[in-house]
Amino acid sequence: FFVRRNTAKGLKKMEYNGLPEKQGLYDPQFEHDACGIGFIANIKGKTSHGIINQAIQILKNLAHRGGVGSEPDTGDGAGILIQMPHAFMKKVCKNEGIKLPKKGDYGVGMLFLSPDKDTREESLERLTKIIDGEKQKLLGIREVPVYDVCIGNSAREAMPHIVQVFIGKGDESLDADSFERKLYIIGKLAEKEIRKSGLDNYFYFASLSARTVVYKGMLTPDQVNEF
């Protein structure tokens, strides 16, 4: 938009700022950009891989809401939030020797850690103490397989080590909302302690919940499924 501005001599000139002037209920100070967001679900709550595929397609259709730099294969970030895939988690955890309780009695933390092995081991030790301090159970830790060949050099150089942390209820009588709050507290305490100490600047929970899991990264929408 081009808007008129008064000059010192009372003359008018045209100036470009991209937004219309404040008028009526409109105020340009409240303008802001947002990421592209899509939502799809089965109204009967039925889970399926088909829903995930459709969500990935939505993500790809929103590629114009993302951005890339000089490397066309390094994006500014993309991801997907899904309902807890209990059957899948149970299957992959069995291969890792991790025994999961029934759905809702455990949470999954999608955790970013330092690429340095010693640093992330110390970070996980501190996280374990925090979980114990909140009287919950660490059930196990799973390495998340990634296919980093599909991403750009800049994204690969900045990529954290990714694991899934499985946390069980310390008290089986704990209701779903209370357990969700416990997981939230664990995540915030861990991020505050570990990042504030300067031990691991990579330490970050993309999600920590008994209900949902987030897969995301410095990706383009087309890379999420492959990565």
Model-derived features: positions:
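N-terminal segments that mediate ammonia production and transfer
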Residues: 10-227
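Short, Lys/Arg-enriched N-terminal segments with co-localized hydrophobic residues
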Residues: 1-13
